[in-house]
Amino acid sequence: LNQFVSHLVQREDALFSNLATRTNGNYDKKVKKRLQDLPDQFSYEKLEEIATAEAKVKTNNNDLGISNHFYNTRLKMKLKKLKGFQKNESYVQSPEYNDLQLVLDQFAKSRTNVIFVIPPVNAKWMKYTGLSQEKYEQAVQKIRYQLESQGFTNIADFSKDGDQPYFMEDTIHMGWNGWLAFDKAVNPFVTKAEKAPTYHLNDRFFSKDWAQYKGTPDEFK
């Protein structure tokens, strides 16, 4: 398990090592020149105006609320073939629920206070591809039950926001106003000190029964 977690950390380091900081060239190229676009005084309302204005320009070549770049490079040429392709898709049954439990187990052992973010799916994309809203919400409830029943109660759940204007950048990733909502939800968690949590793990979440369970989560035995 420790080896697994070490691997996760290495992957995380690799992922974030190129992010812009004041000590590398990316700061000047990717951050400094954009600072002039920000309001002089911090304001979510003003930031939302800026985000919305930018999003309108960058999503103006399609009806899905998806960035022009993503649409042009990933969807445009095959869009017709993708219509209805997710009508039989479901995330309710998956071995990844067991994988999640492995991560929770390590967090509990280290008494790490964490916040989980549940992103939405682009509602227009969901409708176009036929992805079941009911099954999607069922998967979200299953995830939430696995977390909350074991004491992982810090959850930023945006699963119902996939239809909000300019909330998404593509099919499944949050965009302009989505990141503002993310900041509002996560900022209190990272800025306020909290006591180390106490978790109550249930090893039944490691079982194949749970991975394949389709019923009401709190009725799982």
Predicted regions and their residues:
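A structural motif corresponding to the C-terminal end of an alpha-helix
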Residues: 101-115, 143-154
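Secreted/periplasmic serine-hydrolase-like ester/acetyl group-modifying domain
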Residues: 1-108, 203-221
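C-terminal regions of proteins
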Residues: 132-135, 139-221
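Alpha-helix initiation/capping motif
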Residues: 10, 94, 122, 163-167
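Active-site segments of SGNH/GDSL-like serine hydrolases
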Residues: 106-131
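A glycine-rich, aromatic-flanked flexible loop/lid motif
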Residues: 69-77, 112-121, 158
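A generic short-segment signal for beta-strand/edge and adjacent turn/coil regions
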Residues: 82-86, 123-126, 155
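Charge-dense, low-complexity intrinsically disordered segments
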Residues: 90, 94, 130, 173
